[in-house]
């Protein structure tokens, strides 16, 4: 199981770094910050499917 530590999130601003992650909602997030903000917003219902684009 692959996981990402989102304990430091949410953050008000994300960088534009492009290191895509695929969420369990089948959406590609451009980087960890955007992914973790979505995880927090979803109350943890979104999880990491895999690294890279969906």
UniProtKB/Swiss-Prot annotation:
Do you know which SUPFAM superfamilies this protein is assigned to? Kazal-type serine protease inhibitors
UniProt keyword Protein transport, yes or no:
no
Q: Is Repressor included in the keywords of this UniProt record?
A: no
> What residues are glycosylation sites in this protein?
43
A GO molecular function held by the record:
serine-type endopeptidase inhibitor activity
Q: Which UniProt keywords apply?
A: Disulfide bond, Glycoprotein, Protease inhibitor, Repeat, Secreted, Serine protease inhibitor
State the source organism's domain of life: Eukaryota
One annotated Gene Ontology cellular component of this protein: extracellular region
Q: Where is this site: Reactive bond 3?
A: 16-17
For this protein, the record's CDD domains field holds: KAZAL_FS (cd00104)
Q: What is this protein called?
A: Ovomucoid
What organism, scientifically named, is this protein from?
Coloeus monedula
């Amino acid at each position: 199981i692959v996981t990402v530590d989102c304990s430091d999130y949410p953050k008000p601003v994300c960088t534009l770094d492009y290191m895509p992650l695929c969420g369990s909602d089948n959406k590609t997030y451009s980087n960890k910050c955007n992914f973790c903000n979505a995880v927090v917003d979803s109350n943890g219902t979104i999880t990491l499917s895999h690294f890279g684009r969906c």
